[in-house]
Amino acid sequence: CLSQASGKDVGALMNTWISQPGYPVVYASLDNGELALRQEQFFTGPHQPSDRLWPIPLDANDQRLPEILKEREQHLSPAPDGLLLLNHQNASHFITCYDDTLRARILQAIASGTLTPSQRAQYLNEQILLARGGLVASSTLVEALAAFQNESDHTVWEIISLAISDLKKFVDQDEAAEKLLRRLSG
């Protein structure tokens, strides 16, 4: 039995995931020296507000964070002062919306080659989904693409291609944005 082997109540963890539709977005933000984590159901179109909660295995690269986010919101102090990645091995079923400070740290790690190809692809894919859902501006996606200027991994380039395709829908009427997108896409 998985519960015996792992020492965790796998049945209770999985029940929520298989009994309710959708999946969550976790907002990660820094506030007065604390890390705030908040979960909501992720939507890409018109929707009614949802009060659904999931037990979310965070799989953070910072071991001080809890293994599972069970509440709607949780605050942790002190906040990590370096790179923070949630779901850093891409093993959980949620997306993360980082605040500007955390996002800037990730983009710096992408530009410097610190993240693995899988982590780079995951981050960019999440940004595409967040832009489609209206949770981040398409300009945030353009900013993210700039960090991939030296990208060499084929899989990551497939995700970059998806991002550029999505962005073309928004920049056709904006000459400055179109020029920037052309410069980024070569």
What are these regions (language model features)?
Residues 1-186:
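Non-catalytic accessory/interaction domains
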